[in-house]
Amino acid sequence: MASHPKVFFDMTIGGAPAGKIVMELYTDKTPKTAENFRALCTGEKGVGRSGKPLHFKGSSFHRVIPNFMCQGGDFTKGNGTGGESIYGAKFEDENFERKHTGPGILSMANAGANTNGSQFFICTVKTDWLDGKHVVFGQVVEGLDVVKAIEKIGSSSGKPTKPVVIADCGEISS
């Protein structure tokens, strides 16, 4: 069996380099969801319907809640109301086979059933109440310390106390 693709985020916190997060994508169970995320890491699909590049580079983690998760992926508006998939509109929930079992789980943020775009979150704890509602499509394999550093500047409202930016991102060739 082919190995899962790996992608990376080079993160900054408050403008300072914070390290690299490497994520493995579950292309076996969630191929459509994983491919969307992979392509948004590389930027290879060009410009989307919004007129913005279909690329996470330069976008922020706009919602960070300690003891819950770090959310990003809104590269069109930057505030949690935007984002766009490589498929154009929103796309369906592929399946809920994988669960929110603990820190480092990578899952799709949504606004209800079948509303996946580009927003995602990385769990910092087990979030089993999200099972069956959000599609788990990967996990952090390196840089959980960076995720924890991001979590530390979160707040109960979700607004980070410093800007958290994906300075660079892409796919790691195996």
UniProtKB/Swiss-Prot annotation:
Q: Briefly describe activity regulation.
A: Binds cyclosporin A (CsA). CsA mediates some of its effects via an inhibitory action on PPIase.
Q: Known EC number(s)?
A: 5.2.1.8
Q: In which tissues is it expressed?
A: Widely expressed in aerial organs, at high levels in young rosette leaves and flowers, at low levels in older tissues.
Alphabetical GO biological process terms: protein folding
- PPIase cyclophilin-type domain: from which residue to which, for each copy? 8-171
Question: What main location does UniProt list?
Answer: cytoplasm
Its recorded reaction(s) are: [protein]-peptidylproline (omega=180) = [protein]-peptidylproline (omega=0)
Q: Which GO terms describe its molecular function?
A: peptidyl-prolyl cis-trans isomerase activity
Q: Determine if Isomerase is one of this entry's keywords.
A: yes
Instruction: Give the superkingdom in one word.
Output: Eukaryota
Q: Where are the transmembrane segments?
A: none
Q: Which residues form a coiled coil?
A: none
Q: Which Pfam families match?
A: Pro_isomerase
Cellular compartments per GO CC: cytosol; mitochondrion; plasma membrane
Q: Which UniProt keywords apply?
A: Chaperone, Cytoplasm, Isomerase, Rotamase
Q: What class of enzyme is it?
A: isomerase
The protein's location, in the record's own words, is: Cytoplasm
The UniProt function text for this chain reads: PPIases accelerate the folding of proteins. It catalyzes the cis-trans isomerization of proline imidic peptide bonds in oligopeptides.
Record family assignment = Belongs to the cyclophilin-type PPIase family.
**What's this protein's name?**
Peptidyl-prolyl cis-trans isomerase CYP19-2
